[in-house]
Design a protein with these regions (language model features):
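Conserved glycine-rich Rossmann-like NAD(P)H-binding loop of the short-chain dehydrogenase/reductase
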Residues: 31-59
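Substrate-binding pocket helix/loop in short-chain dehydrogenase/reductase
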Residues: 84, 112-113, 120-125, 231
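C-terminal substrate-recognition "lid" of short-chain dehydrogenase/reductases
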Residues: 95, 239-268, 273
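Catalytic Tyr-x(3-8)-Lys segment
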Residues: 115, 218-245
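Catalytic loop of short-chain dehydrogenase/reductase
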Residues: 144, 153-177, 182-191, 203-204
């Protein structure tokens, strides 16, 4: 991984208990940042796999500390504005500032649009889209008040570029929404020297994906490739990307190297969208 200089900075990472969020937290620390590691630490009714736990969040904290950086762990649901506001306030109280917001928290479930119940739709949209807005709102307010710029990076998806007829209507809608929100926030916050971007992964080897496979079977990935004109990875068909591949993009977009990059959604998809 290239070297970045986040010395003296503070990164606020959501969904940090495992998967991509843990990877992001660890690498922000590796490059010199202190970390606010946030996760929900309880399950959601319509999600068919276990979400991050308190023990996993503590393990992430240990990884950050092993890199020689300070860490604050917070349990919060990104879909709850009061909890988000309190988490941001506690982070600023602890470290004095936030420099980078990593909007990584997300969930997945599956049902055809005409059969999906409202609770499943609401829980996913509330986490994957509303949660990105709420965290961006409250950290964005801090950036404006502080007057020293900032970075917001959010996890979109290749599902934000196309329709997917595999019980993913809510997920597709949310990720399209993240792309639109990213562009709008970039325009609104440019005058405050805040860069706002997103990353669009394809299939990543994380607890979320393995949880979906366990809940719905291997065919959920096989059918995905068939419905979407080929494999998720054109270099190594059948192989998923690793969390660190997405972290690479997060680090770049959070760094001064991407000073004049804003409003984009960067695919890290092993050629998936090229087809």
């Amino acid at each position: 991984m290239p070297e970045y200089d986040f010395d003296g900075q503070v990164a606020f990472v959501t969904g940090a208990a495992h998967g991509q969020g843990r990877s992001h937290a660890q690498y922000y620390a590796k490059h010199g940042a202190d970390v606010v590691a946030v996760d929900i630490s309880h399950n959601k009714e319509t999600v068919p796999y276990d979400l991050g736990t308190s023990d996993e969040l503590a393990e992430t904290a240990t990884l950050v500390e092993e890199e020689g950086q300070e860490v604050l762990t917070l349990e919060a649901d990104v879909s709850d504005e009061a909890e988000v506001a309190a988490a941001v306030e506690e982070a600023v109280d602890q470290f004095g500032k936030i420099d980078v917001l990593a909007n990584n928290a997300g969930i997945e479930s599956s049902a055809e649009a005409t059969k999906m119940d409202e609770a499943m739709w609401d829980e996913l949209i509330d986490t994957n889209l509303k949660g990105v807005w709420l965290c961006s709102k409250h950290v964005g307010q801090h950036f404006i008040e502080r007057g020293d710029g900032g970075k917001i990076v959010s996890t979109a998806s290749t599902s934000g570029f196309s329709g997917i007829p595999l019980g993913n209507a809510h997920y597709v809608a949310a990720k399209h929404g993240v792309r639109g929100l990213t562009k709008t926030l970039a325009l609104e916050l440019a005058e405050y020297d805040v860069n706002v971007n997103a990353v669009a992964p394809s299939a990543i080897d994380t607890p979320m994906v393995s949880g979906m496979v366990e809940a719905y079977g291997e065919e959920i990935l096989d059918e995905g490739g068939a419905a979407l004109s080929g494999p998720f990875n054109i270099f190594d068909p059948g192989e998923m990307l690793e969390a660190k591949d997405i972290t690479e993009a997060y680090m770049w977009l959070s760094s001064d190297a991407a000073r004049y990059v804003t409003g984009i959604t960067l695919p890290v998809d092993a050629g998936f969208l090229a087809k």
